[in-house]
Amino acid sequence: YAGGVFAEELLENGIQTIVLDSVGVWYGLRLGANGKGRGYDIHIFGGEHGDLPLIPTAGAVLAETLVRTRKSAIIDTTGFATEAEQRRFMADFAETFYRLKMRNKSRVTLILEEADDWIPQMPETTELRMLGAFQRIARKGRNFGIGLLAISQRPQGVHKKVLNLSDVLFVFGISGKHERKAIREWTEYNEIDEDVRDKALGMLPGLKMGQCLVWAPRF
């Protein structure tokens, strides 16, 4: 839900927004607040609600199209038959998108739903090219106008090189040991005061729906 609010704010302010959706839920941006009627004018590629289907070999073509037109889009990968097809598509997309943005600078935000699908901490061999492409976007993309919003229920599954590059961290209620360990490591990397860190981490299991803690140590 919080990610959707961010996306709405970006779209309201005319910022190109591209959602990489591996769960098939972001089509709701096109619906009105009551679940009916018209929402935002955003293209959907792939999935049950797609305007056009996704072809595993068309990642580079779609990246080129979105850079050229500067249109917002939802890329729904739920229709791919295999994980291999999804990884190939996203590797091609991310590599081409970054390369073209180097020559075509403009503001755009990539939203990675279930970010551990795209930037896994423990990648399989077939995920390495995709991971490398997104790592480069996370590390250097801001120089060309690319912002990155990574959403995950499993922060321990998100590659640490990318997680540690995050300027702002929103943490909603979590109680799992491994999840809290990943958050602790991020706060330690960013040199958050130990007393503040321990108090905040102790609050996480008790947060209610819609409540979150926000860390922004560089601001």
For every predicted segment, state its role.
Residues 20, 75-77, 149-151, 171-173:
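Conserved beta-strand segments of the P-loop GTPase G domain that flank and frequently precede/overlap
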Residues 14-18, 70-74, 103-109, 143-149:
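Loop/turn-to-beta-strand initiation segments
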Residues 29-30, 79-88, 102-105, 116-134, ...:
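Conserved ATPase-coupling elements of RecA-like P-loop NTPase cores
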Residues 22, 113, 146, 153-154:
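Conserved H-loop
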Residues 5-9, 30-38, 48, 56, ...:
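Conserved ATP-driven motor cores of ASCE-family P-loop NTPases powering translocation/secretion/packaging/pilus
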Residues 1-2, 149-155:
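Ser/Thr-glycine-rich phosphate-binding loops at phosphate-binding pockets of nucleotides
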Residues 4-95:
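Switch/coupling segment of Walker-type NTPase motor domains
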Residues 11, 95-103, 130-149, 191:
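Substrate-engagement module of ASCE P-loop NTPases
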